[in-house]
């Protein structure tokens, strides 16, 4: 079952066994129907970069397998998407903007889930047709007091691992990140 909520925001936990979460336009991947067709489109980093450059895929590169809480938030021209005060206080790093060209919706899941369909465990988020700038924020949710239960699991209301902000691309905005690694490596 997919999680679908109103246009502005959706939060869910998604998992990957391939070390990377991604946001993608399912219409661009309608030809992906099995492992062989997935492999033809996404096996190598150069394949992934091609889709990033085309605006059909944005990496949320977790750098490992696991389940991650992801919040997707869309803004408008009048009210751009932004982090909340809590998210800002616990933000570890933000990506440079990625291009996302929407044909009506975005899906988020493990890279192994990419196809034209929203499979179980994938977040579905409506995004009107158009060109968008997507910024991915990594949040240190565990640093917030009271965010974990006795077993170290997030409590209800805990911040997510990732906050993904989707805003209309500005006219003339041409510099978008195209790297598979979502965040710049720290200097030093």
Summary of predicted features, one role per range:
Residues 53, 127-129:
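Short, well-ordered loop/turn elements at secondary-structure boundaries
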Residues 85-120, 125-127:
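Extended, solvent-exposed segments with strong compositional bias
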Residues 130-134:
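A short tyrosine-centered beta-strand micro-motif
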